[in-house]
Curated annotation (Swiss-Prot):
Component of the CIA complex. Interacts with CIAO2A and forms a complex with CIAO2B and MMS19; the interactions with CIAO2A and CIAO2B are mutually exclusive. Interacts with CHD1L, ERCC2, IREB2 and POLD1. Component of the MMXD complex, which includes CIAO1, ERCC2, CIAO2B, MMS19 and SLC25A5. Interacts with WT1. Interacts with CIAO3. Interacts (via LYR motif) with HSC20. A motif (LYR motif) lies at residues 176-178. It comes from Homo sapiens (Human). Coiled coil: none annotated. One of its GO terms (cellular component) is cytosolic [4Fe-4S] assembly targeting complex. It comes from the Eukaryota. Key component of the cytosolic iron-sulfur protein assembly (CIA) complex, a multiprotein complex that mediates the incorporation of iron-sulfur cluster into extramitochondrial Fe/S proteins. As a CIA complex component, interacts specifically with CIAO2A or CIAO2B and MMS19 to assist different branches of iron-sulfur protein assembly, depending of its interactors. The complex CIAO1:CIAO2B:MMS19 binds to and facilitates the assembly of most cytosolic-nuclear Fe/S proteins. CIAO1:CIAO2A specifically matures ACO1 and stabilizes IREB2. Its main location: cytoplasm. InterPro entries: CIAO1/Cia1, WD40/YVTN_repeat-like_dom_sf, WD40_repeat_CS, WD40_repeat_dom_sf, WD40_rpt. This is Probable cytosolic iron-sulfur protein assembly protein CIAO1.
Length: 339
């Protein structure tokens, strides 16, 4: 099992600082990293080496917590502890901050683009989730402020093909939102984690959602539409989400991030025990009660907490990770034979 995750290289992405988050561009050719040094770095390959192509240092006054590429790949959004979100426009190797989104009362913890590229979501320690609309002139307007959580909101993620938004919070819940008559509403609350929910990832179909938590478990939730054959109760026309699998006993500390590979279906986790783990759904497992096996476990992936794992969207098995040690590492995952 140990050979199924092979190190390709490491870069000191944010020296003397934490590296908080990573995001691949849609083409899979560039990786954005962000950190406690207030900087964003853009990484690309030259030959077999990963090199820094750009440093975005002018946008933020405090830690940059998360970054996200627009679906077209021409824009990068960055969420910062300075309570702002910057929108950067890519022009060849250069990036220009074209807009700064203000409104959150304190630290912005996450930012995510909808698959259409016309909507952006942000969330904050102020307990709110904001939905922004983007028009043809690249003007951003807040169209909804959602106050469904009772604590710090850690992460937002969009469904891969629908305008359905999910958020994870310090209040131990996951919430889902959709648009209804020109406003956004909370359409589901997923309860079951016993501590902070740190991150979320939809599977390639969008029918399942994975969540990871300070309670050291991963939960897999499945969407059931009204009138479903399984007889899962739904309220009105809203789908119901039910926990169909819990991965427990694998992680010894907080699970900070989870990534669901859109190409292979492999599930990777970033953990406070300095390790990276990869899980695969077992062949012939029951869709209503799936089982997953641990197929890779790298104990010392980094020298400190692993904060993020990110699968490349185009190259199967290429995984990037980052850590409190300031480094970004690149890995090749190969599914073990016989699984």
């Amino acid at each position: 099992m140990k050979d199924s995750l092979v190190l390709l290289g490491r870069v000191p992405a944010h020296p003397d600082s934490r590296c908080w988050f990573l995001a691949w561009n849609p083409a899979g050719t560039l990786l954005a990293s962000c950190g406690g040094d207030r900087r964003i770095r853009i990484w690309g390959t030259e030959g077999d080496s990963w090199i820094c192509k750009s440093v975005l240092s002018e946008g933020h006054q405090r830690t940059v917590r998360k970054v996200a590429w627009s679906p077209c790949g021409n824009y990068l959004a960055s969420a910062s502890f300075d309570a702002t979100t910057c929108i950067w426009k890519k022009n060849q190797d250069d990036f220009e901050c074209v807009t700064t989104l203000e409104g959150h009362e304190n630290e912005v913890k996450s930012v995510a683009w909808a698959p259409s590229g016309n909507l952006l979501a942000t969330c904050s320690r102020d307990k709110s989730v904001w939905v922004w609309e983007v028009d043809e002139e690249d003007e951003y307007e807040c169209v909804s402020v959602l106050n469904s959580h009772t604590q710090d909101v850690k992460h937002v993620v969009w469904h891969p093909s629908q305008e359905l938004l999910a958020s994870a919070s310090y209040d131990d819940t996951v919430k889902l939102y959709r648009e209804e008559e020109d406003d956004w509403v909370c359409c589901a609350t997923l309860e079951g984690h016993e501590s902070t929910v740190w991150s979320l990832a939809f599977d390639p179909s969008g029918q399942r959602l994975a969540s990871c938590s300070d309670d050291r478990t991963v939960r897999i939730w499945r969407q059931y539409l009204p009138g479903n054959e399984q007889g899962v109760a739904c309220s009105g026309s809203d789908p119901s989400w039910k926990c169909i699998c819990t991965l427990s006993g694998f992680h010894s500390r907080t699970i900070y991030d989870i990534a669901w590979c859109q190409l292979t279906g492999a599930l990777a986790t970033a953990c406070g025990d300095d390790a990276i783990r990869v899980f695969q759904e077992d062949p012939n497992s029951d869709p209503q009660q799936p089982t997953f096996s641990l197929t890779a476990h790298l104990h010392q992936a980094h020298s400190q907490d692993v904060n993020c794992v990110a699968w490349n969207p185009k190259e199967p098995g290429l995984l990037a990770s980052c850590s409190d040690d300031g480094e970004v590492a690149f890995w090749k995952y190969q599914r073990p034979e016989g699984l």
